[in-house]
Amino acid sequence: MLVEVGNVEAIFRYPVKSMAGERLERGILGWHGLDGDRRLAFRRMDDSSSFPWLTASRLPELLLFLPQRGECGTEENLPTHVRTPEGKLMPIFGTDLAKDVGRRYGSPVEMMQLKHGIFDDASISLIASDTVREIGRLASQSPDVRRFRPNVNRGYVVEAKRS
């Protein structure tokens, strides 16, 4: 017997690691997460570690960059351009975008595409609305759920009776 444990309030996808995300009406969830999620990232060219990706913890401005799809889209429905915080639209694999981000970061970067995505910990991130509300209560703020960069924002939980 299926038991309802909650509802999905929102689905988010972040095509480029640490850049602005997009809200989806629906998505395809597979072994490697949500299709199109975190499939692109800037690689720090001077970093040979096992995690060379440029993230918002190193460059908070990345969160203000907005990946956008062209009319035709691309294979795997990936973005074709990025709108900078100043409003400039640049090709996602163009040298201008890499130079702009590298200048802000202070070191060269290059855009990379990975088949299975670039995840810090898990290929899908879920957060409950109750968790966000409790964090807000404790911090005396109303945080935007996107601050936590979830793929799924889960709503209420129902106590299920089994027969």
Regions found by a protein language model. Give the residues of each.
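Electropositive, beta-rich accessory/interaction domains or terminal extensions
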Residues: M1-S163
